[in-house]
């Protein structure tokens, strides 16, 4: 498995070959290197293979050549949303707001919300089936499932339940990734590392969240923003010449977590009793979390400052500029953020993907949801280069330069 040093990107579109030097190296920050294959590749499985090669194992038997020459590409996408739609006019019936007020400040017109009978696992499984169908991959051929969510329906994770719903008979490894609105981006990078360093062939990456369950529906500052959805992509191993994952850039800043969170609630009564010398805290009480708390102004400043920097860093590692990309695909948080980032990157509006108006902020689902809609509508075509970025609570943010198909 690839370590925290990241993955490499051996190839680029043929149309860009004159502008970019293909690379296979890995540098310490986890990005592409244009210096060729480094003398040491930071994958334990590869290092072990090098020892075997030194001992006389033939190159055809060596795992080094298989992994170093291995790329990965996105071959299928899918999405699913709940049937229940909540419009801005619906919200205006129980909070002091209006369609004009919400749309002007966020770009959102409606959102989809899970009802009491709905399951996030079912929604994720539906999105996954759609992605597998497009990729022409059978559930039994899945090697790994990554469920990117901050709202699992089981404390220990929902990925195994998605695996069960899909009927994967080979019991592939399935686990959750929790990184809020950046979750899908981390899942995509993790999938690439698993393919390149771990020998996996078909990895299913799902972004699914039901933030409606953690929203204070009396707070017009947050309840207007969020919707529920699921999106998925199939990441598949390929030859290095077909590689579609060029570079990535990932960050987190715990100091900014106070601006966007849903924290564990403390019992102030117990704390007061403890100050009087009594034994408290046992047996532990059932935990509960606050609703989503957000300082909108600070989150906006964070996004418009850090996201362009992250995308530019990823582009630089890939040997590209913003003029080389076909599409800019950001986490669908707020249209003002999307527009501001596009302006800073000098990407024209006609090359920006946005479906925020119809779904709201769907957290980890937003990027694959928008991608699926753009692919199925014919807007995004095979071979298109996409600069994509997720950002949110933590604070976490990250970008990746990918090729579709």
Curated annotation (Swiss-Prot):
GO terms for biological process: fatty acid biosynthetic process. No inhibition by the antibiotic cerulenin. It is found in: Plastid, Chloroplast. Pfam families: ACP_syn_III, ACP_syn_III_C. The active site is at residues 181, 331, 361. InterPro entries: ACP_syn_III_C, ACP_syn_III_N, FabH, Thiolase-like. Catalyzes the condensation reaction of fatty acid synthesis by the addition to an acyl acceptor of two carbons from malonyl-ACP. KAS III catalyzes the first condensation reaction which initiates fatty acid synthesis and may therefore play a role in governing the total rate of fatty acid production. Possesses both acetoacetyl-ACP synthase and acetyl transacylase activities. Its EC number is 2.3.1.180. Keywords: Chloroplast, Fatty acid biosynthesis, Fatty acid metabolism, Lipid biosynthesis, Lipid metabolism, Plastid, Transferase, Transit peptide. It is an enzyme of class 2 (transferase). Pathway: Lipid metabolism; fatty acid biosynthesis. It catalyses: malonyl-[ACP] + acetyl-CoA + H(+) = 3-oxobutanoyl-[ACP] + CO2 + CoA. Its main location: plastid. GO terms for molecular function: 3-oxoacyl-[acyl-carrier-protein] synthase activity; beta-ketoacyl-acyl-carrier-protein synthase III activity. One of its GO terms (cellular component) is chloroplast. This is Beta-ketoacyl-[acyl-carrier-protein] synthase III, chloroplastic. Expressed in both leaf and root. SUPFAM superfamilies: Thiolase-like.
